[in-house]
């Protein structure tokens, strides 16, 4: 365990960014927190979490794949992908850190997504423990401990001190470049963890029951009449999918500038009526079917195919951002009523 006075945090950021790009959660002009390239004077946000997740750094909303240049009858491939460079992602919360493991199951399984894999290989994740969990948080339901976040490096802030623990070879390599960190014990961290875990037990969503969902529940849940009632209030705006740290759906499009055809991918949403649109039509033409697909995927289909691992991390972003307050917790509770 290492430590650093919080007053020297900017010096730490400067040392890290001297060798590679550093992203930290910082407030923008509108007061919204997002992961931003650190520059001198940019301060770490005091908000619990960013509006959009840290997923953006590994799976960007828009990403170049390849280009084509046509000269007469000749077609040439042009490398247009953004080059992967080493970077450090500081201040990732435990929920977002778990989301990387979920995305890994999708993009790093064979055949590997080389674009995602390159970013994962070049990124060093520094997590930051939560001390003030909010009412929308329910990550413990999925076995996540926000007081002990996992990452290449885990950090805690307590008594105006940053505590720093390297967990992987990447973490050790970065730590070795930061001589301002001093050895210490973990007594202060252990005390903070105890306080945070006590707070978690008092949250409104503490003890959220997941017994009605999970692997093997397709037959029991697919034709439940509650889907109609739940889906009727949904606007189909897709906000939940764009703030979600685990959604991984995308579309592939092409843009012709006249000199170069650029093929790129961009996030898509299963809540949209033209999602996976094909010449024969869309596979889920109604709002009910699309709504059911979104939540069945996170709560049943993904666990079915991934050793029981849910496709949700309990970050609470969909609870905070849905304009009509329809969210995954309401779905879980509604489906669990008959089960209980």
Locate the predicted segments by residue:
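Active-site-flanking alpha-helical
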Residues: 100, 245-249, 323
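Ferredoxin-type iron-sulfur electron-transfer modules in oxidoreductases and energy-metabolism complexes
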Residues: 210-232, 250-340
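Basic (Lys/Arg-enriched) interaction patch that binds polyanionic ligands
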Residues: 231-251
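Iron-sulfur-associated redox domains of electron-transfer enzymes in respiratory
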Residues: 1-217
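Short alpha-helical basic/polar micro-motif
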Residues: 93, 238, 242, 320
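General structural feature for long, well-ordered alpha-helical segments within catalytic domains
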Residues: 8-12, 240, 266, 327
